Design a protein with these regions (language model features):
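Glycine-rich Rossmann-fold phosphate-binding loop(s) that bind the pyrophosphate
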Residues: 135-137
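NAD(P)-binding Rossmann-fold cofactor-contacting core
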Residues: 149-176
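Short glycine-/small-residue-rich Rossmann-like dinucleotide-binding loops
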Residues: 201-203, 226-227, 247
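Adenosine-phosphate binding glycine-rich loop
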Residues: 8-13, 229-320
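Rossmann-fold NAD(P) dinucleotide-binding segment
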Residues: 193, 204-221
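Short acidic low-complexity segments
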Residues: 177-194, 211
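N-terminal ligand-binding/catalytic initiation module
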Residues: 1-109, 117, 127, 296-299, ...
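Short helix-loop-beta connector
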Residues: 123-130, 152, 217-218
Length: 320
């Protein structure tokens, strides 16, 4: 069994473009009903919005089976620890034997951004050139990286309650992607005027509902990476098409207290990719997606990392 640390995973050299492409394949399989993925069970240690989730999935077309064991602890930033952490176990779908254990911090960051890009391909205007980012952390970075694969991005409008985080973010995005980054002083400035809006703060059971109705432009698209945490219900109701990556799992979240004031779901991402449900149809419609982050995302990426690591001699082989 091959163990891959976070640095090993990164060293395989997998690109965001490859991840976006593989996720689209996986969601097409899901849209055909060819993916096995039960709603993720979880535990919630401590108080507030802490979670530890088990996320299993089997994608026959990609010969991928396994599970991610992932945690999210919002207070970890104060401890100078990652908000998201965990491990991924990849199994051989023919024998059931585990073939790899790998750190999942980088995988989670990259596949979440990639899912936004796949959603935006079907729900955003294809000439979208500006992105408003609220929350200049890991997901604020990976979502811009992924959107830059699919869209002719020119400008990022960045807001974060921590000004130092916003300044560091602006420099990094400019240096890495050559994009013009404007830091703004309030959330509305990052929403109004942006072709694409990404909210990427902590996931909260009770939304702080900062983004109000009327802020989002006609024709814009929003990716709610932090669920509905940032959004007032009236702002959500302005959506022409409110989508998600998995309707069944969204219903599960509603049962445990999340998403209490959202519009009816138009489609999940598999239905958009397969054409079962319509994506964007006019330049004027406002579209949104609340992608939950699925085991499918991780299990689409994990085999690519594993096979590349084996080919390149990366990682540590563990003996029984």
């Amino acid at each position: 069994m091959l163990y891959l640390s976070q640095s090993d995973v990164i060293a395989t050299g997998l690109t965001m473009s490859e991840i976006v492409d593989e996720l689209e394949v996986a969601f097409r399989e899901k849209g055909k009903g060819l993916v096995e993925m039960p709603p993720k069970p979880g535990i919630h240690p401590g108080n507030g919005d802490n979670f530890i989730h088990a996320m299993p999935a089997y994608i026959p077309a990609l010969k991928s089976a396994g599970m991610k064991w992932v945690s999210g602890f919002p207070e970890n930033e104060k401890r100078r620890l990652p908000y998201i952490s965990g491990l991924l176990i990849l199994n051989d779908p023919e024998t059931g034997l585990p073939i790899s254990v790998m750190d999942c911090i980088w995988i989670t960051a990259m596949r979440t951004g990639a899912a936004t890009a796949v959603s935006a391909k079907y729900l955003a205007r294809n000439d979208s050139s500006s992105v408003g980012v609220l929350g200049c952390g890991v997901q604020g970075r990976s979502n811009v990286e992924a959107l830059a694969v699919e869209f002719p991005l020119e400008k990022v409008i960045a807001y974060d309650i921590n000004k130092d985080s916003a300044r560091l973010y602006a420099k990094e995005i400019t240096d890495r992607f050559g994009l013009d980054v404007k830091m703004v002083d309030n959330p509305k400035q990052a929403v109004t005027g942006s072709d694409i809006v990404v909210t990427a703060g902590p996931i909260l059971r009770k939304p702080h509902a900062t983004i109000k109705a009327g802020w989002m432009d006609e024709g814009a698209f929003a990716s709610l990476v932090d669920f509905d945490s940032y959004w007032h219900p009236d702002a959500l109701r302005e959506s022409s098409k409110f989508c998600t990556d998995d309707t069944a799992q969204l219903r599960h979240y509603q049962e445990i207290g999340y998403f209490q004031n959202i519009p009816p779901v138009h489609a999940d991402l598999g239905e958009l990719v397969t054409g079962v449900k319509s994506g964007r149809q006019t330049r004027e419609e406002k579209n949104m997606t609340a992608n939950l982050g699925l085991a499918l995302d991780d299990m689409a990426v994990a085999p690519l990392i594993y096979h590349r690591a084996v080919e390149q001699g990366i990682g540590t082989w563990l003996t029984p």
